[in-house]
Amino acid sequence: MAKPLTITSSHSHFSLAWRAYFEMTKPKVVALMLLTVLVGMCLAVPTAVPVQPLIAGMFGIALMAGSAAALNHLIDRRIDGMMARTYNRPLPKGRVSAKRALIFAASIGGLGFVVLYVLVNPLTAWLTFASLIGYALVYTAYLKRATSQNIVIGGLAGAMPPLLGWTAVTNQFHGHALLLVIIIFTWTPPHFWALAIHRRAEYAKVDIPMLPVTHGVEFTKTCILLYTVLLAIACLLPVLVGMCGPMYFVCSSLLSSVFIYKAWQLKYRDHDGLAMQVFRFSIYHLMLLFMALLIDHYLWS
């Protein structure tokens, strides 16, 4: 009777460990990021994306993005344990040790780099590596604790995925790919500032100088509103250069109008929970916008 119990116990331990490591990769964030990678790939070519860069590119970029997320967990483990939103993460709870987290991040990051370098192209491998360093080290380890403009400057690393998808297929830069980067770069501040308003007290408690902590909630609301207007303009750039057609134009205009309206509400008609509503809508905004880009591309082409 002891043997089956031992096997069951081992299986249960493995399952819990696997879930902890998987959680460290921030799968929901990576999934949204991979959508923007896929759109970058598809917009780079007029027909179907070649199979090898599609599969190897998505796999390699996903591994390196997961590595960056795991490093973020590792670096932020102290403050994560003090914040209600993050105290249940694997490192603060002791489900994964710091040493094992580092080994895990290095392993999947290294594997992802090799996959991209060998099976895709060196340009994409190095760009993805630069994004990993930008997010995990420049943003998480330095900017996040150094300046209230942390998310503005550090947002560039998180805006790179469409370019990575583009270079994975073409092995070269293109202005159209940079327009997609601009969209995500402009989207990032209002997305995170809305969350920062909701979690202002927690960020202040752990000495993270998010904009609502250093400049106040009202100033942050104004910045969110201004950035949603800038984002609406950025979202029209693909139309202005002939990259997209009427279907994307209509979807983009509708999504931007709703985002601006919600930001206006946050500034002038705020109520409990509205900041989190803006935060959640921003996720749907980006997801639906890039889906519209993808659908329009095949309709327009």
Curated annotation (Swiss-Prot):
CDD domains noted in UniProt: PT_UbiA_Cox10
Reactions catalysed, as given in the entry: heme b + (2E,6E)-farnesyl diphosphate + H2O = Fe(II)-heme o + diphosphate
Membrane topology note: Multi-pass membrane protein
Listed GO biological process terms: heme O biosynthetic process
Keyword Membrane: yes
Enzymatic class: transferase
Any one annotated GO CC term: plasma membrane
Gene3D superfamilies in UniProt: UbiA prenyltransferase (1.10.357.140)
Record keywords, A-Z: Cell inner membrane, Cell membrane, Heme biosynthesis, Membrane, Transferase, Transmembrane, Transmembrane helix
EC number: 2.5.1.141
InterPro entries from the UniProt entry: Protohaem_IX_farnesylTrfase, UbiA_prenyltransferase, UbiA_prenylTrfase_CS, UbiA_sf
Note: Carbon 2 of the heme B porphyrin ring is defined according to the Fischer nomenclature.
Family: Belongs to the UbiA prenyltransferase family. Protoheme IX farnesyltransferase subfamily.
Role noted for this protein: Converts heme B (protoheme IX) to heme O by substitution of the vinyl group on carbon 2 of heme B porphyrin ring with a hydroxyethyl farnesyl side group.
Name the UniProt record assigns to this protein: Protoheme IX farnesyltransferase 2
Organism, scientific name: Shewanella sp. (strain W3-18-1)
Record lineage: Bacteria, Pseudomonadati, Pseudomonadota, Gammaproteobacteria, Alteromonadales
